[in-house]
Regions:
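Conserved class I S-adenosyl-L-methionine
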Residues: 1-44, 58, 62, 148-179
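A short acidic, Gly/Pro-enriched loop at the edge of an enzyme's catalytic core
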Residues: 106-116
Length: 266
């Protein structure tokens, strides 16, 4: 069951590491670029943008450089404090920073934003309330505007972290360590160091989005090629363009660490 206080505490304690996470290694840097390229396609200068689950502001800096006007929201007060510290150079682009939960955006009016960006973990962390979160994110997006979101990928994560599973099976048994994860996408606290989140197949994300007033415009994996090939990406930046192209192939959508989707509010 979704526990917003737990998520807030987790990210309060995670602190500065969230700022470093997106640049700490080639995999994270490639993921950042894949996500960033999509909002460069669907957010334009002058747009009023809600960034829901902003963290300390890596994506905010990019949105500001594009000329967007940004309302910053995060469930973690500590992440918002870091955000204020890390984004002082773009303060004129930020209308406000607010503590907010993606399942309840009632402080905002219907159709208030030209675009909404919800990248990273928020949809995966709200567990059984994911539909509520999508409904709220779309409600505050104007008709014809875009919602850009990402979730953590089930199939891709199993593929990438496969070497961990034998030890998990030895400790927790097949049904809990593998069977439950594959069937439900739920990473429980027992096998994930106290951390609970939901991983998605592309089919599951697509079906959820199709229950709401929107149409899917674009979809992408993140980190389809780079995992296990980090050295090549470090040595030759041209691989980045191949990664971005490969991630958008239909057959690749389930193969990365995240699944990114762009939908248009109808």
């Amino acid at each position: 069951v979704y526990d917003p206080e737990y998520v807030a505490r987790f990210y309060d304690n995670y602190g500065e590491r969230e700022w470093e996470r997106l640049v700490v290694d080639p995999v994270q840097r490639v993921s950042f670029e894949v996500h960033k390229r999509l909002f460069h396609e669907y957010v334009k200068a002058g747009d009023r943008v809600l960034e829901a689950g902003s963290g300390p502001g890596r994506f905010t800096l990019e949105l500001a450089r594009m000329g967007a006007r940004i309302i910053v929201g995060d469930i973690s007060p500590e992440q918002l404090r870091l955000h204020r510290e890390k984004t002082m150079e773009i303060e004129r682009s930020i209308e406000e920073r607010v503590v907010v939960d993606v399942v309840d955006l009632s402080r905002f009016a219907d159709g208030e934003f030209d675009a909404v960006v919800c990248y990273g973990g928020p949809i995966s962390y709200v567990l059984e309330r994911a539909d509520d979160a999508v409904a709220e994110l779309l409600r505050v997006t104007r008709r014809g505007g875009y919602l850009l979101l990402s979730v953590m990928s089930l199939v891709g994560s199993v593929r990438i972290f496969f070497s961990y599973f034998p030890d998990l099976v030895a400790t927790h048994g097949w049904d809990l360590a593998v069977g439950k994860v594959i069937r439900t996408g739920l990473l429980t606290s027992e096998i994930n160091n106290g951390h609970v989140l939901r991983l998605y197949r592309w089919r599951e994300l697509r079906e959820m989005l199709e229950r709401h007033p929107c149409r899917i415009i674009a979809a992408s994996a993140a980190n389809f090629l780079v995992n296990g090939n980090e050295e090549a990406f470090e040595e030759d930046q041209r691989w980045l363009e191949e990664e971005i192209a490969a991630c958008r192939e239909p057959g690749a959508l389930d193969g990365g660490t995240h699944i990114v989707a762009v939908v248009q509010r109808t």
